[in-house]
Amino acid sequence: MNFQKGEIIAIDKPYRMSSFKALAHVRYLLSHALHHKVKIGHAGTLDPLATGVLVLCTGKCTKQIEQLQTHTKEYTATLQLGATTASYDLEHEVNATYPTEHITRQLVEEVLHQFEGDIEQVPPTYSAVKVNGDRAYALRRAGEEVQLKPKN
């Protein structure tokens, strides 16, 4: 492998590790093994509580990052129906619960179909989206209100 010329690497990002920290760790390992600094970037981010494929590009392949981000993605999730948190994930405690008796497999499948294809969604305020140079989740953790625009 020629990391200076450019390689595309897929890693399984660990739970509770930021995408940046995962990238920094791989950069350190490569630079240490090769005895020189390696240019490296990631094609998209995963939230710290998410695990899964993080695509890393080295050397001249970093120029392909924007194009790689246009590819379709598929997600799987484990969730608790009838409970909400401030961050929509396990980072915060459950702050409200709702009845779930009416929820059927058919209803879940119908709702999931609404998330297929080209859709617009407002990201959660506890997300990695940048707002005036700062991550939305950092602003929220500092107690600031965040208004995010829908993304495709």
Please name every model-derived segment.
Residues 1-152:
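Catalytic/RNA-binding core of pseudouridine synthases
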